[in-house]
Structure formats: structure tokens, C-alpha cells
Amino acid sequence: LPTSDSNISLGLSYGATLISTSAIIGFGGLAGWIGFSIPLTMIIPFVGLIYIATVYIGPKVWKANKKIKAKTYIEMIGKHYNTPMISKLLALITVGLIPFYCVAVLIGVGKFITTFTGIEFVHAVIGFSLLVFGTIVYGGMSSVLKNDMIQGIIVILGSLIVLSITVFVHMQVPGFWDNLVGAWAAVPEGDGLYKLGFTGFDTWPEFWSRGWLMITTLLVFTIPVGLITLPQLQTRWMMAKDDKSFKTIASWGVIIPGLAIVTFMLAAISAN
């Protein structure tokens, strides 16, 4: 693996891999339905846990790989546990499942290109595939790192623009926050949200209710633990320059998830 000389670029690429468009749309829509309990709950696990994991777990992964000198994450796992069978199993799983993921991504990108350019779907998919292939062959993980860094910059700029416009527009409406709270209060008592334990636009669900359990188990435990165990994140930890780089990497890496949470707040505001 190449070593990244820029902690900022590594942090931006790290953060960019944590957030996807589908996650923003999905959780944004959910926030528009049930209110601020979604983004407020996500602040602690997404920002706090990811930062702590990067600062405290990242250096250990880096030091372990410095001794092993593995070229891939799969190789590092096998050498660390001194079990080649693990590497073979992980490689088999990767080779078997990655094509399904690639097909889904290529279909989405192909339809996007077709919609905005008018190019035939087949030509769009072939052209994009050749572009990705050339990038990987030419630069390897360095190309992936730079691509993710650019994606992270775009996400930051786009989020700040959307944030500024949305806040400016809604601030023009007198008492817009009271209107949001009032709209939630107008929901009939027998509505499904009340049955699940939700109590208001800017309040938490009742403790141990179905709504509280849904938010806690999904957003506090399941997703953050899954995020910090993603192989592509471990791979970026392996690419750090030294074990002192991780505070900078973590600081820049949590910016993008933080902005995503702001996006969920904006979704809750604009949807209501």
C-alpha cells in the first residue's frame, strides 16, 4: 500500500467513504417524518465514536501492519492471526460478492449519465467502466484516495451551500420554528408515530418505547459499529504516514458525517 503524505487528504477520503447518497436520502426522509430525534441521535455515534475509533484503534492497526508489511487488508488479517485460511476465505467472499455491488453501482451511474447527457445506457456503462479501470490500473490505491478526497470536498461545499440557502429561506418565515413544533402537535393522538412512542418534532421518544428502541438500536449501535469495521476504512488507516497522524485524520474525517447530520436536520425542517 502507498503511504499518504497528506493527513488532510486521507481524512477527507476517510470521511467520504462513510456517507453515501442513499444514506442521506433515506435518513433525510426518515428525519422529515419523525423529526429531530434522528439527527440528534446520530451526533454521538457518527461523530464521537468514529473520532474515538480513528484516534485509538487506527494507530494500533497501523502499528500492526508496520510489523507485518501487508499490501492488502485481507493479507494483514491472515498474517496477523497466522492463518492463511482466513485470507483465502475473505478473498473468496470478496471475489464472489463484489461483482453484485459493482453491477448495482454501474447501473446507477449509467442511468445518471443517460439522463443528463442522452448517451445510450450501454455506452455510458462501458465508458464509465473503462474510466474506472484506467484510473485503478494507473494509480492503484493512490487514485482511489485522491478520488475520494475530491468527493469529500464536493460534499463539504455542497452541504454548506444547501445549508446556507435552506436556513436563509426558512428564516424569512416569521416563527418558522414554532410552526414546525405546532405542525407536529396537530398530529392526531391515534397516529402511528404516537403509537411508536414519539412525542414531538424536537423531543426524544418515550424511553423503551418501540420508537426509542428503533432509533437506539439502529443509529447508536448497529450502524456505527458497522462503519468502523468497514475494510476500506481499515485500509486507509494502514496508509497513514505515522501513528501520530490519526488525530488530524479523525478531525477531517468527521467533518463529512457531521455535515450529513446537518443535512438530516435540514430535511426535517424542509419536509415539515
Task: Give residue ranges: language-model regions.
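Structural signature of transmembrane alpha-helix termini at the membrane-water interface
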Residues: Y51-P59, V103-G110, G134-M141, L160-M171, ...
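Loop-to-helix junctions at membrane interfaces in multi-pass transport proteins
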Residues: P2-D5, G26-W33, S37-I43, G78, ...
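Hydrophobic core positions of alpha-helical segments in small-molecule transporters
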Residues: L89, G127, N147-I150, I249-W252
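Membrane-interface "cap" regions at the ends of multi-pass membrane proteins
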Residues: L1-I25, I136-G139
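Helix-loop-helix module between adjacent transmembrane segments
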Residues: T41-I136, L218-G226
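Residue-level recognition of pore/gate-forming positions within transmembrane alpha-helices
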Residues: T17-L18, F46-I50, T94-V95, S129-F133, ...
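Residues that define the loop-to-transmembrane-helix transition and helix capping
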Residues: N7, P84, V122-H123, M141-S142, ...
